[in-house]
């Protein structure tokens, strides 16, 4: 596997910082053969697969009046290959807010991951005599509320 990564960061005055991470790579799964002996002897052969894939991640940090901050993150993962198949593209958006209190020694925060519930792993797998399409739903939507204090 070989690839390239580009990271861009920009401060917008004192109120915002924007970051963009671009990642591209060539993924190769070499062809292979395997002999399964159980329950009966069966030879499986997979052809060589190759794909150009990558990801994009955007992160924005925004500072507002009264020590209030907001963070927005979005992630796109391009289609990729696995032995015997393919993983389709995935996307998610996360959001977090925090408020500094107690002379900046404490903070109250709220964050939520995968707001649109789009981080599903859809894949196809195929082989000699079978083909299936699946979508895995992990528990990616999480909301956290908390308080921290710095001594």
Give the residues covered by each predicted segment.
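Gram-negative outer-membrane beta-barrel transporters
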Residues: 1-75
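Transmembrane beta-strands of outer-membrane beta-barrel pores
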Residues: 24-28, 74-80, 112-118, 151
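Short sequence motifs at beta-strands and strand-loop junctions characteristic
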Residues: 48-52, 87-90, 137-139
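Outer-membrane beta-barrel translocator domains and adjoining extracellular loop/strand segments
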Residues: 30-41, 73, 81-88, 121-127
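C-terminal beta-signal and adjacent terminal beta-strands/loops
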Residues: 99-151
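Active-site lining segments that contact anionic ligands and/or coordinate catalytic metals
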Residues: 3, 67-69, 90-94, 105-107, ...
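Residues on the lipid-exposed face of transmembrane beta-strands in outer-membrane beta-barrel proteins
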Residues: 4-10, 58-62, 95-99, 110, ...
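Outer-membrane beta-barrel proteins
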Residues: 8, 42-48, 60, 81-85, ...
């Amino acid at each position: 596997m070989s690839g390239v990564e580009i990271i861009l960061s920009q401060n917008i005055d004192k109120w915002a910082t924007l970051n963009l991470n671009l990642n591209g790579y060539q993924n190769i799964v070499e062809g292979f053969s395997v002999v399964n002996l159980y329950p009966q002897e069966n030879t499986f052969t997979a052809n060589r697969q190759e794909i150009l894939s990558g990801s994009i991640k955007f992160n924005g940090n925004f500072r507002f009046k009264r020590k209030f901050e907001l963070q927005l993150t979005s992630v796109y993962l391009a289609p990729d290959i696995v032995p015997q198949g393919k993983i389709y593209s995935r996307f998610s958006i996360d959001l977090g807010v925090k408020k500094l209190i107690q002379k900046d020694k404490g903070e109250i925060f709220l964050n939520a991951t995968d707001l649109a519930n789009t981080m599903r792993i859809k894949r196809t797998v195929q082989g000699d005599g079978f083909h299936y399409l699946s979508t895995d739903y992990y528990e990616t939507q999480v909301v956290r509320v908390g308080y921290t204090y710095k001594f």
